[in-house]
Amino acid sequence: MGLFGKTQERPPKDLVNEWSLKIRKEMRVIDRQIRDIQREQEKVKRSIKESAKKGNREACVILAKEVVHSKKAVNKLYASKAHMNSVLMSMKNQLAVLRVSGSLQKSTEVMKAMQNLVKIPEIQATMRDLSKEMMKAGIIEEMLEDTFEGMEDQDEMEEQAEMEIDRILFEITAGALGKAPSKVTDALPEPEITGAMAASDEEEEEDLEAMQSRLAALRS
């Protein structure tokens, strides 16, 4: 509190340094998220190989779709890191300008980066707060509400995604299933039916559902 009950404004340099620290912290959150998804991806790939050996083509396709969705999620997270790095570089420039002019400057580059970052669920709350602080400091203009809303990016399995599924299956099963870039139409070799294999069908389905749930949780 300053004189007469007014809140004293913080020095611009302190604001920039604090923003940079918050962004670096969120980058570490993104890094952890990427590692978690990639670890789960490796488990899914192993499961695809096992399902291929058992002749369970349906499970292979379902799991391959999960790999495609996970790859998209990881790509989005890497893109968000690039936007964060862009903001960090702009913050360094702001400090340089601050030393010369004594004030922070409006930045369209930061504005564009923050518009993208507020759409990332994993870091949305922090990025919203940072955006409001930057607006108050005059670095960016006020964002439209629809920039904050409209976060749900529904990934539809279109033709390109189907081709990617086929490629993944071909790759992971060493050609037993899928012929990139054709769509998946191949049948897996018929496995030998044993009592143990029949008994494990229900357990395999439960494992499949559990794996899908874990990946969905990591992506959300």
Swiss-Prot record:
Residue positions of motif MIT-interacting motif: 201-209
What keywords would UniProt list here?
Answer: Coiled coil, Cytoplasm, Endosome, Lipoprotein, Membrane, Myristate, Protein transport, Transport
Compositional bias annotation for Acidic residues: 200-209
Mode of membrane association: Lipid-anchor
Q: Which GO terms describe its cellular component?
A: cytosol; late endosome membrane
In this chain, the stretch annotated as Interaction with STAMBP covers: 203-207, 219-220
Name assigned to this protein: Charged multivesicular body protein 3
Q: Which organism is it from?
A: Xenopus tropicalis
- Please name the gene that encodes this protein: chmp3
